[in-house]
Amino acid sequence: MIHQITRAGKSLLAAGCTLSILFASDSYAATALNVSQQPLFLTQGVAPNLLFTLDDSGSMAWAYVPDGISGNSGRAGRSSDYNALYYNPDYAYQVPKKLTLSGDQIIVSDYPVPRFTAAWQDGYAQGSTTNLSNNYRPQWGTGWLGCIDSSCNTGRAYYYTYKVSASCPAQPVSSSNSCYTYNALPTSQESNFAIWYSYYRNRILATKTAANLAFYSLPENVRLTWGALNTCSIGANSRSCQNNALLQFNKQHKINFFNWLANSPASGGTPLHAALDRAGRFLQTNGTAYTTEDGKTYSCRASYHIMMTDGIWNGRNVTPGNLDNQNQTFPDSTLYRPQPPYADSNASSLADLAFKYWTTDLRPSIDNDLKPFMAYKSGDDSKDYWDPRNNPATWQHMVNFTVGLGLSYSLTLNSAPTWTGSTFGNYEELMAGSKAWPSVDNDAAPGNVYDLWHAAINSRGDFFSAESPDSLVQAFNKILTRISERNTSSSKPAMTSALQDDGTGDKLIRYSYQSSFASDKNWAGDLIRYKVESTSTGSTKTQEWSAGALLDNRAPATRNIYIASNSGTNRLKPFTWSNIEGSQLATWLNRNPDKDNQADTKGAQRVDFIRGQQNMDGFRQRQAVLGDIVHSSPAVVGPAQYLTYLANPIEPSGDYGTFKTEADQRSPRVYVGSNDGMLHGFNIKTGVEEFAFIPTAVFEKLNKLTGISYQGGAHQYFVDATPVVSDAFFDGAWHTVLIGTLGAGGRGLFALDVTKPDDVKLLWEYDSSTDSDLGYTFSKPTVARLHSGQWAVVTGNGYGSDNDKAALLLIDLKKGTLIKKLEVQSERGIANGLSTPRLADNNSDGIADYAYAGDLQGNIWRFDLIGNTRNDDPDTNTSINPFKPGDVDPSAFRVSFSGAPLFRARADNNTRQPITAPPTLVRHPSRKGYIVIVGTGKYFEDDDAQADTSRAMTLYGIWDRQTKGESANSTPTIDRNALTAQTMTTEANSTFGSVNRNIRLISQNPVKWYKDGATGTANSDVASYGWRLNLEVNSSKKGEMMIEDMFAAGQVLLLQTLTPNDDPCDSGSTSWTYGLNPYTGGRTSFTVFDLKRAGIVDSGSDYNGSVVSAFQQDGLGGLAITQNEQRQSEACTGDECIIFNPSDKSNGRQTWRVVEEK
């Protein structure tokens, strides 16, 4: 629909405003273009080092945990309530994975399920067997036990359960056999018991299986070496260690690891110091730790050590001293003074050794380019540095993840830090240092167990205390999740807010819906709802649900996934094999993507996979059901969008008030596109997926999702664009309609009626089979009322159409038929396509009058949607000759200025500057016409990942003077020489309060609109037609571009730029957030951003007395504009919200609100 914009100093919904715009967003692609099917901002990356140490001590052969119950092998020892290693009838034991190599392809299968009458005593060796039906004897230490009760003399497998009673306390005890009830194993549990017996019965078997199940899905880009406490040294590359050199975890090296793991023995002591020291020295001395097979050295390679043990360390033969209790200077020049939770009074503990290999630059000869892991941000950089949950180290160092099996019983000292089940569960107590780490020594309990925990903290890792096979699997999985590549997304968050009564009836509660993906997790995606609350130093986010986690735990058959149908009132049918068998879609799904789409008969299985079935043989092994969400921002559908008094005049025959009353009561949804082939609709309160739709335009490549090769370079985009939601009128009633596009996923768009969230209807689909001029649908549509009377979807045709044309498409909202196509002139031989349009309502009557859009050839086009000559006067907002909807025939719609562009964007070297972001409009300060603001840049082809430093991209503000509805047959010749130039004068690093930032200063050159002595306002009187700002600092061209939406908020133009970076030791791109004067393109006269996160914008955020116009800010996908609880304006990325001032009089609480982008 239509939204108003402001002149300087007015509210964004000011009563006297005479210009309205219909918002929309980006676009991309073309047949002559090489449209990337992977996120361009993902560099190949540098594979991390992972060192794995297994405890192979003699106690690993024992069949009980913890050590302290060694004398309690009676009934308690044969109950999982007391001995967590014993068979648990409530747990479904999983067989481990077996990996074999076929050519270059890893084949993953399951180890066989043992027979109950012949279960292997070691499921990996598969030698001796036991008949569990008549010859079962429990294992305790390294030997076997006989039966206790006469009821088990038959020798059938059995277990005991503990029952709480007046004489049997809640905590299971071993002293009273009467508290335990004997259970002969029922027939239904025979297979489960046999799996436990062969693969989990004792510590070494349980550890092997837990590691097996975690490591089989470890990303192949990780580099792995392994070792044990007694029998194998890390990095030895010996045959006895199965050739354990530090290599990428793929092909034969992966097979070697699993073979070594399966054959690891259990004998010897527990020399953890020597093992940790070996790992650290390997990273410090072995040349392969930071080089690749091609000999390149990378300074950003992270290194992690996983050390698993079941016991209390002994054999302390490494004595580093009491390092964590000594003053020292870290490699980044940070001064360390002993402080909690790092320091203690113990000398040469595991914690000291871990501290040594974290604080020491293990390779001082190479640069310190490791990326800090700062998951917890308080707004105080110094506090965040010392937060043990973060890892600020940029130098080469080792992070330890320690795992203790059956050791939680030792973590109970009242005088020591309180163990609550996780490393930082008692975070406040740890940071306060109110309880000291206990003393340690050889075989000392419980101090040596606390030392494992302390060692993880001192190296910025994690400690896991596992008591059962299940918790051991979870521990390994959590470690590998932490090590894996950070999740990221190229979409901005959806921000919603609501007033909540806090006693004053005036507390604004905000929610953020943040999408993400993880390429290293086989393209897993997620959508998370956060509650966002402001603090004195910024804002905090509290997760309320994860849609990805909820989908992983949902039965595929219960999902509501639909495709188009030619029948039925909703024109939708469930996506099941029975509904598509015999169709063209079934033919496409009966193709093997790993064998050049050869026909097979697995279409039904592929349907099951797409619906969410996991662990299917021969198909891709995903780590999550929800696919990657890269460029699609969430769209929230809740109450009605508009005020009744504004909506009713647009459709006098409709009753928006009644519609609004009903819509305000509907169950809210959040919709987002994903590259699993679907548009998803989630319940906004619970995160449960309520609806999903697979567009017809992606049918042909759905089978690719199942391919084993998909993890590599075979990734595809599917529904990779932001849905647009708008209220509109048709069929005699108001509706809420969602328009979906595909981005790089395909050449199509679709419309869904989402008025009733539990009764979604498909209105239509429009794709390249209907219109060959439709390219990849990067252009974000706008829903608008036209002067012809129709409600329409107005969109650019995108890139990659059959003829590489550029055109504005007007599609009937109800029918999906083409109302009008306005094709623009394109230079032949150069790919073209129209980007996202911005629509303008000239007199605020709710009907679109103009559309502005750029194209790939660097032209800015205006489209007249008014018809014949109109005589509105926007300066006074007086409609002299109003038009009613339906007065204009669509044939009167045309390209303005007789088919000529308003402006041609050319760089200083006269090369074309592509325009892929939508324009933004502001009222010209003279009240004559509008300033059309555009930025240049392109970021969707594979080559765009390489920064173009041959020229600078530019921000432009172009004065369109002919906007009164008059015939505009020509426009003045405007080139960059007719524009006032602004420049970036300074780029610097500075600290604001306690926050360190990279910032930029920009010139403040005045724009002289009219010539000196001019007495009129004719074109001949004009001195400048606008402004321009090259995206370069001191003529240094780094490839910075503008590809996202801009926002004109009051007297500030807000935008985010992107600079590609293909250095594997750097992020794939960097982003800068700008706050400019929209009327000059230069520096504002007032401070814009709260750079110091103080909760107020003042001169403390200036640099050397000058207003900062830009700062480097993490997060991709552009900005979301919102307000915090104090009604202060905030610009948000996925990573940070920062307060900004929209005008020189708007510091503090705001009385205006930001209009959401449409």
Swiss-Prot record:
Molecular function GO labels? calcium ion binding
Q: What keywords are assigned to this protein?
A: Calcium, Cytoplasm, Fimbrium, Fimbrium biogenesis, Membrane, Metal-binding, Pharmaceutical, Signal
Q: Where does it live in the cell?
A: Fimbrium; Membrane; Cytoplasm, Cytosol
Q: What induces it?
A: By the swarm surface growth conditions relative to liquid growth conditions. By surface attachment.
InterPro entries in UniProt = PilY1_beta_prop_dom, Quinoprotein_ADH-like_sf, vWFA_dom_sf
Q: What is the effect of changing residue 270 to A?
A: Inhibits swarming as wild-type
Q: What is its main location?
A: other
GO CC terms on record? cytosol; membrane; pilus
Q: Summarize where Ca(2+) binds, as residue positions.
A: 841, 843, 845, 847, 849
Transmembrane region positions?
Answer: none
Knocked-out gene: effects: Loss of twitching motility, predesposes to autolysis and impairs the secretion of quinolones and pyocyanine, but on the other hand promotes growth in stationary phase and bacterial survival in murine airway infection models. Has reduced congo red (CR) binding which is a measure of Pel exopolysaccharide (EPS) production, and shows both increased swarming motility and an altered swarming pattern compared to wild-type.
Q: Write down the superkingdom of origin.
A: Bacteria
Task: Name the SUPFAM superfamilies for this protein.
Answer: Quinoprotein alcohol dehydrogenase-like (SSF50998)
Signal sequence span per UniProt?
1-29
- Print the domain comment field: Contains a region (residues 173-365) weakly homologous to eukaryotic mechanically sensitive Von Willebrand Factor a (VWFa).
Q: What else is known?
A: Overexpression of PilY1 represses swarming motility in a pilus-independent manner and the repression specifically requires the diguanylate cyclase (DGC) SadC but not other DGCs. Increased c-di-GMP levels upon PilY1 overexpression in surface-grown cells, but only in the presence of SadC.
Q: Which family does it belong to?
A: Belongs to the PilY1 family.
Explain the purpose of this protein. Answer: Involved in pilus assembly, twitching motility and adhesion to host cells. Primes type IV pili (T4P) assembly and is required for inclusion of minor pilins PilV, PilW and PilX to the surface pili. Stabilizes assembled pilus fibers likely by antagonizing retraction mediated by PilT. Calcium-binding and calcium release by PilY1 seem to be essential for twitching motility and for regulation of pilus retraction dynamics of PilT. Regulates surface-activated virulence possibly by acting as a surface-attachment mechanosensor.
* Name the UniProt record assigns to this protein: Type IV pilus biogenesis factor PilY1
The coding gene here is pilY1
